[in-house]
C-alpha cells in the first residue's frame, strides 16, 4: 500500500500536521531555487532580520509584469547535494511578508506560458519551504526561551504557514484546471495532480477553527509554566483548554466528512493502516500484561538507585557519545551525526532552562534535521538522546517525493527512534559500567511503559473525543478509572491530573498510540539482538532505509519479517516482557 491519500480533507489534515508542536515533520527537502527577476519580498533566512523580530521585512509592490521568471543558483552550498551547509546559529526567523507570495500565486492561475507556470510553481514551492522553516525556528525559540514575544511569534508564524499552504494549494489547483492543464499536470506529476485538482480553499470557519487550535495550544504551554496555581487549579484550566480543543477538532472532522475525530486523525493525520477499533482491541489485549507489569516491574528497586556519574552526561558528552556509536550503526548514521554536530543542529540543555520536550524536526529550506532534548541529569538523558537520534538518522537519509503532499506513517517514524533505543541496550556495559544492570532494566522498562502508556492515552483520548460534553471533573475521573483498569495504583488525587502534563493530549491528539505500536516492533528487534546483534542491526538499518512514506506500519513489518500487533500481540511482546519481569524480580530479591 502506498502512503498516499488524494482528497481535500487529507490535504487539510496535512496543513494541520505542519502546526503540530513536538512532532515536527521529519522530511528533508530542498532543490535549486528558481526566483523571479523581481526580488522576492522575503529574504533568505541567512540574510533575514534578527531573530525574534515581529516586524515583516520592508517590501516594494510586486511587479508582476517583470515575469517571466529566470532560474538562479541555489542560495545554499550543499556539499552532498541535499543538506545545506548552514550553521543553526545563522538561521533566523522573521515574519514573512505574504505580498509577493499571494501575487505570484494569483499569477499562476492565469498565465498562458508553460515556462512561466513551471518557474512560478518552483518559486512558490521554495518560498513555502522558507515559510515552514521560519515557523519551525520560531517554535524552537519559544521552547528554548519561552518569552511572551516568542509565544506571539509562534501564533503569527503558524497563521502565516496555514495561509501560505492554503494559497499554494489553491493556486496549483487552479493551474491544474486552467488553460495549461495538461502541460502543468505533466510537470508537477500524477500524484500532485490527483491530490490537488479538486482542492478548495479553506472556508472562513475552517481557518477560524485552526487558528483557534494554535491559540489554545499556546495557552496550554503558557499555563504549564505558571507557578502561582495549585495542581487542582492547573488541572481545571488545562481541562477547559482540552475540552475546547476537542470541540474544535470534532467540528473540523465533521466538516471533512468523518463521523469521529479519531477516524479523521488516524487516517489523515498519521497515515495509519490500522483503525481506532484495532487500537481499542490492542488496549484491551495489553491490560493483562499491564497488570503484571505494575505488580512485578513498575516499582523495581533498580529505579531508585542513584546511578551518579555513570548516568550523568553534559550536552557535549552526549554529542560525543553519539559520535562514538553512530559509526557502529551505519556509515549513513555517522554522516548524519557529523552533519548535526558540524552545523550545531541540536539543542540539549537542562529542563530547568528549556521546555520539557524531546523532538526532532526538519528545517525544510535547508534539508536540515534538528534535534531538541531537555535533560534531567540522569539515565533518561542517554536513552532519550539515542531515541531522538533515531529520528535524526531517518530524517537525514530519507526525503519525501514531494514536500507538499507526501505523508509518512508516524508509527514507522517511531520505530526508527525506539528501535535505536532497543539496540543501544547492547552497549550498556560500555556506557554505564558497573551500573549496566540497572540501565538495562531501565531501558526495557521504558519500552514496555511506552506500550502501556500509549494504550492508556489512546483509550483516554478516544473516550474524551466521543464524549465532548463532559466536565473537567469527569475528565479527571475517567482518566483515573482508565489507569486503574490497567492495574495502576492511584496513590493520590494528583495521579488523576497526570494527563495535563502530556503535551500530546493538547498538541498532537491520537499520536501517543504510535509509541505503543513502535515499541511492539522495537522489542522484536531487541529480541533478535539477544541472539544475533549483527542481524538485528542490519534489520534496523533496512527499516530506516525504507523510510516511512511508501508502506504503512502493518505492511512494512510483514515485509521485513516482523509481526504486527494486529496479527499476534504475544509474538511481539512475550519474550521481552518475560525478560523484564525476570530481571526485576531477580534484582528485588537481592535488595
For each feature predicted by the language model, list its residue ranges.
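C-terminal, non-catalytic "cap/extension" segments appended to globular domains
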Residues: 140-142, 385, 430, 454, ...
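Catalytic zinc-binding patch centered on the HExxH motif and its immediate surroundings
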Residues: 311-312, 345-368
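Bacterial lipoprotein signal-peptidase II cleavage site
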Residues: 24-33
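Catalytic Zn2+-binding segment of zinc metalloproteases
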Residues: 390-403, 423
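Short pre-active-site segment immediately N-terminal to the catalytic Zn-binding motif
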Residues: 366-385
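C-terminal motif of bacterial Sec signal peptides marking the signal peptidase cleavage site
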Residues: 19-22
Amino acid at each position: 500500500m502506498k502512503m498516499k491519500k488524494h482528497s481535500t480533507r487529507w490535504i487539510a489534515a496535512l496543513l494541520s500536521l505542519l502546526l503540530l508542536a513536538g512532532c515536527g515533520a521529519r522530511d528533508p527537502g530542498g532543490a535549486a531555487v528558481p526566483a523571479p527577476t523581481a526580488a522576492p519580498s522575503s529574504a533568505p533566512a541567512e540574510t533575514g532580520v534578527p531573530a525574534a523580530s515581529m516586524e515583516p521585512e520592508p517590501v516594494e509592490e510586486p511587479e508582476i509584469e517583470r515575469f517571466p521568471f529566470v532560474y538562479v543558483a541555489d542560495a545554499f552550498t550543499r556539499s552532498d547535494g541535499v543538506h545545506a551547509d548552514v550553521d543553526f546559529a545563522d538561521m533566523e526567523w522573521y515574519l514573512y511578508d505574504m505580498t509577493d507570495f499571494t501575487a505570484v500565486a494569483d499569477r499562476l492561475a492565469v498565465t498562458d506560458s508553460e515556462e512561466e507556470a513551471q518557474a512560478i510553481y518552483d518559486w512558490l514551492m521554495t518560498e513555502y519551504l522558507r515559510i515552514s522553516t521560519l515557523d519551525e525556528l520560531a517554535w524552537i525559540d519559544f521552547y528554548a526561551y519561552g518569552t511572551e514575544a516568542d509565544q506571539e511569534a509562534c501564533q503569527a508564524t503558524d497563521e502565516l504557514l496555514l495561509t501560505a499552504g492554503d494559497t499554494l494549494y489553491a493556486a496549483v489547483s487552479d493551474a491544474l484546471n486552467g488553460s495549461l492543464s495538461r502541460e502543468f499536470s505533466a510537470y508537477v506529476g500524477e500524484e500532485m495532480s490527483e491530490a490537488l485538482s479538486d482542492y478548495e480553499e479553506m472556508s472562513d470557519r475552517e481557518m477560524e477553527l485552526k487558528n483557534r487550535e494554535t491559540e489554545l495550544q499556546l495557552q496550554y504551554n503558557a499555563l504549564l509554566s505558571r507557578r502561582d496555581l495549585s495542581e487542582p487549579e492547573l488541572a481545571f484550566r488545562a481541562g477547559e483548554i482540552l475540552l475546547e480543543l476537542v470541540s474544535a477538532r470534532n467540528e473540523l472532522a465533521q466538516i471533512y466528512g468523518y463521523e469521529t475525530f479519531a477516524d479523521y486523525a488516524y487516517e489523515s493525520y498519521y497515515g495509519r493502516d490500522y483503525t481506532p477499533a484495532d487500537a481499542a482491541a490492542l488496549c484491551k489485549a495489553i491490560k493483562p500484561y499491564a497488570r503484571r507489569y505494575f505488580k512485578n516491574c513498575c516499582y523495581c528497586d533498580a529505579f531508585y538507585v542513584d546511578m551518579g556519574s555513570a548516568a550523568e552526561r553534559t550536552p557535549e558528552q552526549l554529542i560525543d557519545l553519539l559520535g562514538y556509536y553512530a559509526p557502529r550503526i551505519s556509515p549513513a548514521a555517522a554522516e548524519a551525526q557529523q552533519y548535526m554536530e558540524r552545523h550545531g543542529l541540536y539543542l540539549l540543555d537542562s529542563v530547568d532552562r528549556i521546555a520539557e520536550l524531546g523532538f526532532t524536526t526538519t528545517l525544510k529550506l535547508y534539508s536540515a534535521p534538528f534535534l531538541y532534548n531537555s535533560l534531567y541529569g540522569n539515565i533518561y538523558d542517554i536513552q532519550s538522546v539515542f531515541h531522538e537520534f533515531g529520528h535524526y538518522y531517518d530524517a537525514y537519509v530519507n526525503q519525501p517525493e514531494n514536500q507538499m503532499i507526501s505523508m509518512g506513517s508516524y508509527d514507522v517514524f517511531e520505530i526508527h527512534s525506539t528501535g535505536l533505543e532497543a539496540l543501544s541496550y547492547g552497549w550498556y556495559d560500555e556506557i554505564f559500567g558497573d551500573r549496566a544492570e540497572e540501565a538495562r532494566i531501565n531501558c526495557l522498562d521504558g519500552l514496555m511503559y511506552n506500550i502501556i502508556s500509549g494504550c492508556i492515552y489512546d483509550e483516554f483520548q478516544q473516550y474524551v473525543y466521543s464524549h465532548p460534553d463532559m466536565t473537567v471533573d469527569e475528565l479527571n475521573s475517567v482518566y483515573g478509572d482508565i489507569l486503574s483498569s490497567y492495574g495502576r495504583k492511584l496513590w493520590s488525587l494528583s495521579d488523576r491530573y497526570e494527563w495535563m502534563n502530556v503535551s500530546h493530549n493538547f498538541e498532537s491528539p491520537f499520536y501517543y498510540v504510535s509509541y505503543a505500536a513502535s515499541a511492539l516492533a522495537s522489542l522484536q528487534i531487541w529480541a533478535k539482538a539477544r541472539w544475533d546483534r549483527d542481524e538485528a542491526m542490519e534489520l534496523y538499518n533496512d527499516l530506516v532505509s525504507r523510510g516511512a512514506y511508501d508502506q504503512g506500519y502493518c505492511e512494512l513489518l510483514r515485509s521485513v519479517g516482523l509481526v504486527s500487533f494486529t496479527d499476534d500481540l504475544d509474538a511481539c511482546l512475550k519474550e521481552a516482557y518475560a525478560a523484564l519481569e525476570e530481571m526485576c524480580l531477580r534484582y528485588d530479591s537481592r535488595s
